[in-house]
Design a protein with these regions (language model features):
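Extended amphipathic alpha-helical interaction segments
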Residues: 1-188, 196-200, 205, 216-218
Length: 218
């Protein structure tokens, strides 16, 4: 990633929200919390962690500090009397990698992944994709069309020429006004997320994060 940034300094790097959310859920699995994830309270909290990606970058750290930590301790207190239950390992992972842990002076260290990489608020505002699923889908389809893992140079060139013609046709269809259909369930979910983001200033951090979290699946 650093090498890419040095070679293309003017390019804006944006991470994939799907892979971002999967990183969080893998921590749930790693710490043996899959059964706890069935609980609506715990599941909502984990999804609220992922929902921080939809908060404006300037407010993301404050949202983490004022909302998520408080809810984490409430959950810990609620369940710790009954079993060894805590969301703290997931919160620690999130803070180290995406927020930055405070040093002795109270200043936050740089996280492993900067906020500008995983925050998708502006992408929602500008109606830009939040994942690279379409790219991965194309790669999968292209590999399937080759019908082998190591094609000859000529077979690869023939398939690239064919793909180019297909994309020329797609561009022509778009210019003619043909629209790309999206499954109803995805369209409705996206519309809800857009509405919550647009109404950001009328909610507290906790309300906003819950609103986004109700529309997320990890």
């Amino acid at each position: 990633m650093n090498a890419f940034r040095s070679l293309f300094p003017s390019v804006t790097q944006s991470g994939c929200f799907y892979h971002f959310s999967q990183c969080i859920y893998r921590q749930v699995q790693q710490h043996g919390l899959q059964n706890d994830y069935v609980s609506e309270d715990f599941s909502l909290f984990i999804r609220m962690l992922a929902a921080i990606a939809f908060i404006p970058i300037t407010d993301a750290v404050d949202a983490f500090d004022t909302s998520l930590i408080k809810i984490c301790f409430i959950l810990h207190y609620k369940y710790s009397k009954h079993k060894n239950y805590s969301a703290e390992p997931v919160v620690n992972y999130f803070e180290d990698n995406f927020i930055g842990r405070p040093d002795k002076r109270g200043n936050r260290r740089n996280p492993v992944f900067p906020l500008t990489l995983w925050n998708v608020n502006q992408r929602v505002v500008e109606s830009l994709p939040r994942t690279n699923n379409s790219v991965e889908g194309w790669h999968c389809g292209f590999q399937s069309s080759l019908q082998c893992s190591h094609p000859t140079l000529w077979k690869l060139l023939d398939q690239l020429i064919w793909e180019n013609e297909l994309h020329r046709l797609t561009v022509a269809q778009l210019l003619a006004g043909q629209t790309h259909t999206v499954k109803r369930v995805y369209r409705i979910t996206n519309e809800r997320i857009v509405n919550v983001v647009a109404d950001y200033n009328n909610h507290t951090f906790a309300e906003f994060l819950k609103g986004i979290a109700h529309n997320l699946q990890l």
